[in-house]
A protein has these predicted regions:
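Flavin-dependent oxidoreductase catalytic cores
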Residues: 1-178
Length: 178
């Protein structure tokens, strides 16, 4: 379901905090159930938390918009909250799209030229901020729904077509990039 000409209303700060609380509670339930960690579907494919990260989607003028640190804040606060409640030995991993492959909203790009979403350079800076917040590993990915053929490549695309992008991120952080 996609209505390209309609924009969603901006989520309120109270709603952001409620989302963070729910994610932290879910992580605590997982820990209580015997899990060793949690993977946050947080920073790829154009989902809610990914939209906070991308300036093309995030037009906020508060503490969750503008500069990169502000745009990452919704996730770093969540990660810090999970470690506070579950302990530092409870692993937190995050999926991170290292390149969006879009030229505009609703316009994918096969080549990645004229990137309007996330660039690998920005992904590196995001990865550094996530590592600093306590993320234990990054699950690297590329593409969003507008460039689905990168996120779930068809058989004619070369195997490992984005490995060089993942390697660029790995070179800049001290946590595993998977």
């Amino acid at each position: 379901f996609n209505l390209p000409n309609e924009r969603n209303r901006e989520i309120t700060v109270d709603q952001i905090h409620k989302k963070q609380e729910c994610m932290i509670k879910a992580a605590a339930l997982m820990k209580d159930s015997g899990f060793a960690g949690v993977d946050l579907h947080a920073a790829h494919w154009g989902y809610l938390l990914d939209n906070f990260l991308m300036p093309i989607a995030n037009h906020r003028e508060d503490e969750y918009g503008g500069c990169l640190e502000n745009r990452v804040r919704v996730i770093t606060e969540m990660v810090e909250g999970i470690h506070q409640v579950c302990g530092s030995d409870f692993a937190v991993t995050i999926g991170l799209g290292v390149k969006s492959f879009i030229t505009a909203l609703n316009k994918g790009s096969l080549t990645g030229e004229n990137e309007a979403g996330r660039t690998v350079e920005e992904a590196i800076e995001i990865a550094k901020l996530l590592e600093k917040a306590g993320v234990n590993a990054i699950l690297a990915d590329v593409g969003i729904y507008d460039s689905f053929y990168h996120a779930c490549p068809p058989g004619y695309m070369p195997k490992g077509h984005a490995l060089d992008l993942y390697a660029q991120v790995k070179e800049q952080v001290g946590i595993p990039v998977l």
